[in-house]
Amino acid sequence: STALAYAFAKCGMLSRNRGGMGGYAEYAFGKSGSFLANYAYCVSLLIANIAIAISAVGYAVALFGLKTTPFETCLLTILVLWICTVLNFKGAKITGLISNFTAWGVIIPVAGISVIGWFWFNPETYISAWNPHDLPTFDAISASISMTLWSFLGLESACANSESVDNPEKNVPKAVLGATIGVAVIYILSTNVAAGIVDNAELVKSTAPFGLVFATMFNGTVGQIVMGLMIMSCSGSLLSWQFTIARVFKSS
């Protein structure tokens, strides 16, 4: 993921084409290559945005103690997607302001677990969660690579939004590399610490894993506060991604 981030950063420094990754592909493959790159990227964003919306709904359901059917979850997910789409009508400035604020909803709990979660860390719980399906080493690595790349979907988002960025030749590479490295450190720490606090079986079943971890560390009230923060964060993230996918469609 870091190598990909570096490649995107270099492209951002050298490219003079519009359209982010599609613009990069255009140098070698022309307009058709640009369209195919953007088309494939949009397909991945459609899936990612739905996943983020479902996460927001999952945290909300857990926060309010609701029980929803798959159909009700689908309707709530569609509603969240539309709300974030409508909020983008005001343009990049409003989207940026809202996203900058809501980002703290994930920074606070994730950074918090990374720093203070070690006081509740149980090595035995962590070891039991390590490779729970007892896959051979290389099979486990192969299975995790695709999940890792999926987890870091977003390292290229600054490139996709380069037309909305001031001085993109300098700011896009900084954003891509800095954000990727920062997120990698924080999320690797937080997820590993969480795996040593709550049993793997409970984490897998939970629709609000960070809330569950904080509830285990402190109490249910703290867990609910974290769920509220994560709802805010997921909504802000979805807002940015809806903006991104619109820009990619437009440039295609």
Question: Model-predicted segments: where are they?
Answer:
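Helix-loop-helix junctions that connect adjacent transmembrane segments
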Residues: 67-72, 101-228
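Transmembrane alpha-helical core positions of polytopic small-molecule transporters
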Residues: 1, 46-50, 85, 148-152, ...
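Hydrophobic transmembrane alpha-helices that form the core helical bundles
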Residues: 2-81, 85-89, 94, 230-250
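Short amphipathic alpha-helical coupling elements at transmembrane boundaries
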Residues: 13-16, 20-30, 97-100, 160-174, ...
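Generic secondary-structure boundary signal with a strong preference for alpha-helix termini
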Residues: 21, 32, 42, 60, ...
